């Protein structure tokens, strides 16, 4: 066997007949498979043991030689070599064809390679190959052109006139003769000359032909090899034949296809030996050609060959294609051993790095480890005995299992794995029952809930794999989301509610204003019921020992609440005491107004003070997230995950104590709701009157009515929120961010509002009832449209989103950080992204975590804030924006010069860790997942709103697909191709509008449809590429008008626009990586003196290399223009044919690669997965291959012996 990690590239080409014979271990002469009585393979048949090797290990067919000691012997009776039966997976056979046969891929594919090479139309080729016409191979004195087609009658006429003086043939033989006669060098010269003179269609045809001729010439493939004389037969184990229970046989379709070929081939041989009439031989040759076509690609030409039940047979091509093909089914993803799956349940008592594994499952997964340990401890005598102990589940087995799984992480995965947080590592603990226990905080990353979701468990086996799982994949290490660098493990639902309830303050709480010496007294008082969680109290500030308190503050009393004292115990000591949910309090210090000088208090003491003070807002979900981010910024990951665990315990404990429930009585209906509705009803009447008088159009009336009712709902919502009691459980749930929002609440207690019809149009009759009052039948019926649409949308769009992610990953999978600094001299100018006046993405977010490309001075003090190639940290970013600077040049993936992938400096910091990115990080895949994963949210957003009108987005996912596929957008904007001034805007014919732009040397007029809104005015100066009407720009056109940089920025802005409108934050750098992949190619306009072909797509780096070479030798360089490719096209145009073939259009990619003799240097991830090498990213990179793993760390259990949450 080859060592997979030891080869550097893979090459593909056409096989010559000699090559095919050299692979083969013998010719298959008979169509038989196995003998129906003995069930042994027939000699010389498709499963013959003499050709393909023995069916049983170390045993010949007739049984004369058995056992290993005869290894390598060839039996004198049956001729079978004694060896392992595994050779039947790798030994090939062959068929010697009685007549040459064309290979359907090269004759039928688009464009037909054979046709281009011979300069014949595919139809002419088909007529010759399938014996409908003769082709002239050698015209002799006939005056015919070479390659002319002759019908049967014409051929006879000529044959009678010039017997034996000219040659015309039918079938693949004629084509083969023509192909053998081609002189590639001569052809090349002729074509190059033709390029100089030709125009139009002749030019395009010449370029296509040139490409094929060049391919053959450079690859060393001979054109005649497209015609087969010998057919290889793949090894029998790959097209098996197995016996089913009932004694019948199931066989791979390939065997049927091979049998047809062999039968027809043998018949043809016999006919030729007998000297049968020409017409019969011809018919047989045609049938042989068709049989070989069906074997290689069934259904490509004519009707496919069908098996029993009219099912088309799967040919060799089908074995590679599609989701069930070899590439995607067996090479890119395999089923693995040491894995299990089960339903998940919540494990509130787990630590951040733990999961609960059901005992039986753990025993099965760790079976070999347990067996080894049992034998080592001498509990079992041998492996067999250990195995039976495990199967009996003896008591001692469990103790050993506990020992084995300690410190052995397992991977948990939930499908669909949309981003890298869909697989994380945990340390298993054994649990009773049959459900996997999952830590509640990681559910967000997995997008899991406990309504029946299932998860898969995998065991990393080798020491290196375990080390990687522990260091890189442990859940406690993955706190940040790679798409925006924000914490992904924020508490949710009960945990939020518990902490919210804990930090709530109430006016009427028992013993308000009590003063305590220290926190212990407070906790004792709370335990005894002297104070409530919500009681506002005072505590001597000095007892906190808080380093952020000033001396002055330490002499005073801190006014706070009992709950907040409990909450602050989980916060690290060096933090300010958190008394109000503000960034000021969190990042700097506790505000001074909460420190009260006891001497200034009046008669009523602190109680009187509290009566005059407003209540402080409790801590909601967003603020908890901010706390986590702040702790993460200041401390290690370990401290953060400890705090998260404490926050989780606190949340669960107090949400249980709060006992928050929802009852019908909690839904308070608004008293003056009817009055609001009546007012708006009057407004609608007025609009209807105006319409009836003909003052407004139908469209205006409809829009006005919809606006009136939307306003009514907003008003009711506003008043509801005002009138609500702050301790109302539903309000608490929505206010804390645990579940639900204002809109849900309005539907329960106010009115449901407007609904959308199935078409997506809003029905102007609103639902005035709320769920509390109950809906009328009509209202209920209208409601169902929205709900149904929500469900249908989700189902359809989830698939779309998954497919988008797949295409994105495919186009960017070879973008890996490959060097520290590419040394580019260009930068990207960034500023706020705005749409009109609306902010889409602020400047500060765009520069943070990137490297600067210029020196930035403070405009007033002139001090240097940052120098080129320095990382912009959050502090520096704040300094830059505070100094009033609104734009700057930064390093960007757009301007990176790295040949493959990007460099560290152009990428910036790694968002998943918050550190600088390291060489080997697979940033392309991360970018693709970061853009693809929220795609599902874009889609699912419609579903969660319960089908209320207005929240369903049309611009979401379809717009993202439109951008990345570089399609012509719907609602296209008109752009100007010249710089100048808008001279005139007038009506043109067919109700169109005409915009005239006058430039320095020319005047252009642009037509816009009558309905589109024009956004320029007469006399307004416009730049090249500026938008004249509202709408989306067609990116390909924009590229040629406005240039590369403008197009990159435009695509970036458009993608950000869609996501930010949905409230999804994605870092720019991910979009940059993707857009860069779409702009990797240029189209050659003139080839100059280089070897490039005009009109061909070439990688930018190859283009610059060719030109550099030309300049060196004082030759004419080539010229080219940048091309924007959609992601699907870009994936198929990648340098690696393995990656492209496994993506889409497998046969086309492989045909092309074989003719060009392409070599795949295995630079991307996919290619290496396919051939089974370590991927060249992360620890699989060459530079890390000598890193060894050793164990030095203390067990985690010791690190974790920390104080638990205060009771």
From Swiss-Prot:
Cofactor note text: Binds 1 Mg(2+) ion per subunit. Binds 2 Zn(2+) ions per subunit.
Transcription is among the record's keywords: yes
InterPro entries tied to this protein: DNA-dir_RpoC_beta_prime, DNA-dir_RpoC_beta_prime_bact, RNA_pol_asu, RNA_pol_N, RNA_pol_Rpb1_1, RNA_pol_Rpb1_3, RNA_pol_Rpb1_3_sf, RNA_pol_Rpb1_4
Binding, Mg(2+): 449, 451, 453
Binding site for Zn(2+) 1: 60, 62, 75, 78
This protein's UniProt keywords: DNA-directed RNA polymerase, Magnesium, Metal-binding, Nucleotidyltransferase, Transcription, Transferase, Zinc
Named cofactor requirement(s): Mg(2+); Zn(2+)
GO molecular function: DNA binding; DNA-directed RNA polymerase activity; magnesium ion binding; zinc ion binding
Claim: Transmembrane is one of the keywords in the record: no
A biological-process GO annotation: DNA-templated transcription
Protein's job: DNA-dependent RNA polymerase catalyzes the transcription of DNA into RNA using the four ribonucleoside triphosphates as substrates.
UniProt-recorded name of the protein: DNA-directed RNA polymerase subunit beta'
Source lineage: Bacteria, Bacillati, Bacillota, Bacilli, Bacillales
């Amino acid at each position: 066997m080859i060592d997979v990690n030891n080869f550097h590239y893979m090459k593909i080409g056409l096989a010559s007949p000699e090559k095919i014979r050299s692979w083969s271990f013998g010719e298959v002469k008979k169509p038989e498979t196995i003998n129906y009585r003995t069930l042994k393979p027939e000699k010389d048949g498709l499963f013959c043991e003499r050709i393909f090797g023995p069916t049983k290990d170390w045993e010949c067919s007739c049984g004369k030689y058995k056992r290993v000691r005869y290894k390598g012997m060839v039996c004198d009776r049956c001729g079978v070599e004694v060896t392992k039966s595994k050779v039947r997976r790798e030994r090939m056979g062959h068929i010697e064809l009685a007549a040459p046969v064309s290979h359907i891929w090269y004759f039928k594919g688009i464009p037909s390679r054979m046709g281009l090479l011979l300069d014949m139309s595919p139809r002419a080729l088909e007529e010759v190959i399938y014996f409908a016409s003769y082709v002239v191979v050698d015209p002799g004195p006939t005056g015919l052109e070479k390659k002319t087609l002759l019908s049967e009658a014409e051929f006879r006429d000529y044959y009678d006139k010039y017997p034996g003086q000219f040659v015309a043939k039918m079938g693949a033989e004629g084509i083969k003769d023509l192909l053998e006669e081609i002189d590639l060098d001569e052809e090349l010269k002729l074509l190059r000359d033709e390029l100089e003179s030709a125009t139009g269609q002749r030019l395009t045809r010449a370029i296509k032909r040139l490409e094929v001729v060049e391919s053959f010439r450079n690859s060393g493939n001979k054109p005649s090899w497209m015609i087969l004389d010998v057919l290889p037969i793949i090894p029998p184990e790959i097209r098996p034949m197995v016996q089913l229970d009932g004694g019948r046989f199931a066989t791979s379709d390939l065997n049927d296809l091979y049998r047809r070929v062999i039968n027809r081939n043998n018949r043809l041989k016999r006919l030729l030996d007998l000297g049968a009439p020409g017409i019969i031989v011809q018919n047989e040759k045609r049938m042989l050609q068709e049989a070989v076509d069906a074997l290689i690609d069934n259904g490509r030409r004519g009707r496919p060959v069908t098996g029993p039940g009219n099912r088309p047979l799967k040919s060799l091509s089908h074995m590679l294609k599609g989701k069930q093909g070899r590439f995607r089914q067996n090479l890119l993803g395999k089923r693995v051993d040491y894995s299990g799956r089960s339903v998940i349940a919540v494990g509130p008592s787990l630590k951040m790095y733990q999961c609960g594994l059901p005992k039986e499952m753990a025993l099965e997964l760790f079976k070999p480890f347990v067996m080894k340990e049992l034998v080592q401890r001498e509990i079992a005598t041998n492996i067999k005995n250990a195995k039976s102990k495990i199967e009996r589940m003896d008591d001692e087995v469990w103790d050993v299992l506990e020992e084995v799984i300690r410190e052995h992480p397992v991977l948990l995965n939930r499908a669909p794995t949309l981003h890298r947080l869909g697989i994380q590592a945990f340390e298993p603990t054994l649990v009773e029952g049959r459900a996997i226990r999952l830590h509640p905080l990681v559910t967000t990353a997995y997008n899991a809930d406990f309504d029946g979701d299932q998860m898969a468990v995998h065991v990393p086996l080798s020491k290196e794999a375990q080390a990687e799982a522990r260091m890189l994949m442990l859940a406690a290490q993955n706190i940040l989301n790679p798409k925006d660098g924000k914490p992904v493990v924020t508490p949710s639902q009960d945990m939020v509610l518990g902490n919210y309830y804990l930090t709530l303050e109430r006016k009427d709480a028992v013993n308000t204003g009590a003063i305590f010496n220290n926190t212990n007294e407070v906790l004792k008082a709370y335990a005894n019921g002297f104070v409530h969680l919500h009681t506002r109290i005072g505590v001597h500030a000095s007892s906190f020992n808080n380093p952020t308190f000033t001396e002055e503050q330490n002499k005073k009393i801190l006014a706070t609440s009992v709950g907040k004292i409990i909450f602050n115990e989980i916060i690290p000591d060096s933090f300010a005491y958190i008394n109000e949910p503000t960034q000021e309090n969190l990042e700097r210090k506790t505000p001074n107004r909460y420190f009260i000088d006891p001497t200034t208090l009046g008669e009523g003491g602190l109680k009187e003070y509290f009566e005059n003070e407003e209540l402080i807002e409790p801590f909601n979900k967003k603020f908890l997230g901010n706390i986590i981010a702040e702790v993460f910024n200041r401390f290690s990951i370990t401290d953060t995950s400890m705090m998260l665990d404490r926050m989780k315990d606190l949340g669960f404990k107090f949400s249980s104590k709060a006992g928050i429930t929802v009852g019908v009585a909690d839904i308070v209906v608004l008293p003056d709701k009817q009055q609001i509705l009546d007012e708006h009803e009057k407004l609608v009447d007025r609009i209807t009157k105006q319409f009836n008088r003909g003052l407004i159009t139908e469209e205006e009336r409809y829009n006005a009515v919809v606006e009136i009712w939307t306003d009514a709902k907003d008003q009711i919502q506003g008043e509801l929120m005002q009138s609500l009691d702050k301790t109302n459980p539903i309000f608490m749930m929505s206010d804390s961010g645990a579940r639900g929002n204002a809109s849900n609440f309005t539907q329960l207690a106010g009115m449901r509002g407007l609904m959308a019809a199935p078409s997506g149009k809003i029905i102007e009759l609103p639902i005035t009832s709320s769920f509390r009052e109950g809906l009328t039948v009509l209202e209920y019926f209208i409601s169902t449209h929205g709900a149904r649409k929500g469900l249908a949308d989700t189902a359809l769009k989830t698939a779309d989103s998954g497919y988008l992610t797949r295409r994105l990953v495919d186009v960017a999978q070879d973008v890996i950080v490959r060097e520290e600094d590419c040394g580019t001299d260009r930068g990207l100018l960034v500023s706020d992204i705005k749409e009109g006046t609306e902010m889409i993405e602020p400047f500060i977010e765009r520069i943070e975590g990137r490297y600067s490309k210029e020196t930035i001075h403070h405009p007033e003090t002139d001090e240097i804030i940052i120098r080129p190639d320095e990382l912009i940290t959050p502090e520096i970013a704040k300094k830059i924006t505070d100094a009033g600077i609104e734009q700057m040049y930064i390093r960007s993936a757009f301007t990176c010069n790295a040949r493959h992938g990007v460099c560290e400096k152009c990428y910036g910091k790694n968002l998943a860790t918050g550190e600088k990115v390291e060489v080997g990080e697979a940033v392309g895949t991360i970018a693709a997942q970061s853009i693809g994963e929220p795609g599902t949210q874009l889609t699912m957003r419609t579903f969660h709103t319960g089908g209320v009108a207005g929240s369903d987005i049309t611009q979401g996912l379809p717009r993202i697909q439109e951008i990345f596929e570089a399609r012509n957008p719907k609602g296209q904007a008109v752009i100007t191709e010249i710089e100048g001034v808008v001279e005139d805007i007038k009506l043109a014919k067919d109700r169109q509008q005409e915009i005239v732009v006058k430039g320095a040397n020319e005047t252009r007029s642009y037509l816009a449809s009558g309905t589109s809104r024009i956004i320029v005015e007469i006399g307004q100066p416009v730049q090249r590429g500026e938008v004249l009407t509202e709408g989306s720009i067609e990116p390909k056109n924009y590229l040629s008008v406005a240039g590369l940089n403008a197009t990159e920025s435009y695509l970036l802005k458009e993608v950000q626009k869609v996501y930010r409108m949905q409230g999804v934050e994605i870092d720019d750098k991910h979009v940059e990586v993707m857009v860069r992949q779409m702009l990797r190619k240029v189209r050659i306009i003139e080839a100059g003196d280089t070897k490039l072909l005009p009109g061909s797509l070439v990688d930018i780096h190859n283009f610059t290399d060719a030109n550099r070479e030309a300049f060196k030798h004082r030759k004419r360089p080539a010229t080219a223009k940048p091309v924007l490719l959609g992601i699907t096209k870009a994936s198929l145009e990648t340098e690696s044919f393995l990656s492209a073939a496994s993506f889409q259009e497998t046969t086309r990619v492989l045909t092309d690669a074989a003719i060009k003799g392409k070599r795949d240097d295995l630079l991307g991830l996919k290619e290496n997965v396919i051939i089974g090498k370590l991927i060249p990213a992360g620890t699989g990179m060459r530079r890390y291959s000598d890193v060894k793993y050793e164990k030095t760390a203390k067990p985690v259990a010791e690190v974790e012996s920390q104080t638990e949450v205060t009771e």
